[in-house]
Design a protein with these regions (language model features):
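Polysaccharide-binding surfaces and accessory modules of carbohydrate-active proteins
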Residues: 62-63, 68, 108-110, 124-229
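Beta-strand-rich N-terminal accessory domains
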Residues: 1-67
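Catalytic and substrate-binding clefts that recognize carbohydrates or anionic sugar/phosphate headgroups
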Residues: 42-44, 48-100, 173, 228
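A surface-exposed beta-strand-loop module
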Residues: 243-255
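Extended, loop-rich substrate-binding clefts of extracytoplasmic carbohydrate-active enzymes
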Residues: 78-131, 223-244
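Short helix/loop capping segments that flank catalytic or ligand/cofactor-binding pockets
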Residues: 23-26, 36-39, 44-48, 82-85, ...
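Conserved small/polar residues in nucleotide/adenosyl-binding loops
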Residues: 255-262
Length: 262
């Protein structure tokens, strides 16, 4: 069964059937900052070593597979419906929505079309800077103005893989989060000068720094409470599990061609 094809011109492998029987991963970064991401945006990022300097979390052998990840959610504020640019974690029916993944040379692009909205999310790590860039583009292909909210989400690691998985009585107090001027900062209390951050090139309309506040009780990345409600809660704390979620409300106007013939 064929799930994709090579795009020789762009030097990409294009996965246009995303319900793969196993994970198809790509490696980002060529120097100190690296990431491993799969065809549905699941994966993690690390600095130099994935054992001692993980930036974002990953749960090996998890169900559903390859969680968590580096996700972007879109919410239609007219009816409360929401989806993710990558097929997972929301997992809209493939009969209702179209998804693609493009694995390139040290970058990956996720594409979706749903309810007259086409969107893309490109993950890449530049050679000169130890950062992961999320390039998100949204286009209104429908015949009406659209009121949307866009949410980012990644789950921060405590840096050491053992701390992420053992002795929660201690590890839940080894990091804290804060928010100021559009920047989420995650501080590691047991590492001198240890911190990581999440920000964007826009003024956010909301944020969440706490994973359990963004996701909500008895929920998963499939149906986060902040996305369902349409508003992040502004959470932060000196302890607990932390995430990077920034919210941006946008109005997508109708597309008009500069040519009167179109």
């Amino acid at each position: 069964m064929q799930y994709g094809h090579f795009d020789n011109e762009k030097r990409e492998y294009v996965i246009d059937r995303v319900d793969l029987p196993a994970s198809w991963t790509n490696y980002l970064g060529l120097k100190d900052m690296c990431a491993v991401v799969n065809h549905t945006a699941g994966g993690y990022m690390f600095y130099k070593t994935p054992e001692y300097h993980r930036i974002t979390r990953f749960r090996g052998n998890s169900i559903p597979m390859d969680r968590p990840g580096h996700y972007v959610y879109i919410r239609d504020n007219s009816d409360g419906d929401y989806w993710s640019i990558s097929w997972q974690p929301v997992g809209k029916s493939l009969e209702e929505a179209a998804y693609r993944c493009r694995h390139g040379m040290s970058y990956t692009v996720y594409e979706s079309e749903y309810k007259g909205i086409s969107a893309s999310q490109k993950l890449s790590i530049p050679l000169q800077d130890p950062v992961e860039l999320w390039d998100v583009k949204i286009k209104n292909d429908s015949d009406r103005k659209r009121d949307l909210s866009v949410f980012s989400y990644c789950e921060f690691s405590f840096h050491h893989i053992m701390t992420d998985n053992q002795n929660f009585q201690m590890s839940m107090y080894c990091a804290g989060s804060s928010y100021e001027d559009g920047i989420i900062e995650h501080d590691l209390f047991y590492e001198e000068f240890g911190f990581q951050y999440f920000t964007g090139n826009f003024e956010p309309d909301g944020f969440d720094c706490l994973r359990d506040k963004f996701i909500g009780p008895y929920r998963t990345e499939d149906n986060p409470l902040s996305v369902e409600k349409g508003q992040c809660g502004g959470s932060f704390e000196l302890g607990n599990n932390h995430c990077g979620s920034l919210q941006k409300n946008i109005t997508c106007l109708l597309y008009t061609s500069p040519s009167p013939r179109d």
